[in-house]
Amino acid sequence: MELYTAPPPGSTVICADELGPVIPRTFPPAPGWSGDGHRIKEPLEYSRGPEKTWVYGGLRVADGQAVTLCAPSRNSAFYQEFLQLEEQANPEGTIWVITGNLSSHDSKSTRAWLEDHPRIRHAFIPMRACWLNMQEGWWRIFRRQALAGHEFADPDEIAHATQVATAQLNARARPWIWGRPQPKPRSYRRRFIYTLKERSIKQ
């Protein structure tokens, strides 16, 4: 994972992934409070339906800033639109995109698009190794911020929640560092060792 630990000089490393599909609720809105006084929260549905929404996300490892895009489908066209946003957000240098080897990421259409955008290069993660993608960690934070405990009536509400959560997370973003951080040095208290010496008492 040299792109994480020692990226090429002047380059930008982006971890990219898609979250979803997410669909709005398929039931009438429930009352805000239950009979015993507890707040009612319906879990967000992850399923396939006519109004499903995919969330494209890209994490800039160097400073923790993220770019997101909501789309009604996961295909080459929307992936290229997402890459265009990344290119606009990173106007200088080579952009390394670390992502999974999905068909839309390496389709004929996407490869042709990349020929016209030579600054963007792919580094594909091996199959069954999604844990190598630091975007997965950002998704966990995003789900708690934007989706957990919320109901959405339509895709527009999902897009709005995504936009707000992304802005809030970017406001407090920090660099993402690959691997475990080194433990802090321990501070030891001074140890005072008292040695008792026996004295021979002359009688």
Residue ranges and their predicted role:
Residues 1-81, 189, 193-196:
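Extended, low-complexity cationic-aromatic segments
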Residues 100-101, 123-145, 154-158:
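RNase H-like two-metal-ion nuclease catalytic core shared by retroviral integrases
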Residues 15-17, 58, 64, 83, ...:
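Mobile genetic element proteins and their domesticated derivatives, centered on retroelements
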Residues 76-95:
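Short, basic/hydrophobic alpha-helical segments
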Residues 18-22, 61-63, 102-104, 128-130, ...:
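Short, solvent-exposed loop/turn segments at secondary-structure junctions
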Residues 38-47, 114-134, 150-152:
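RNase H-like polynucleotidyl transferase catalytic core
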Residues 14-16, 95-99, 123-126, 177-180:
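Short beta-strand segments
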Residues 160-203:
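C-terminal domain-tail junction helix/linker
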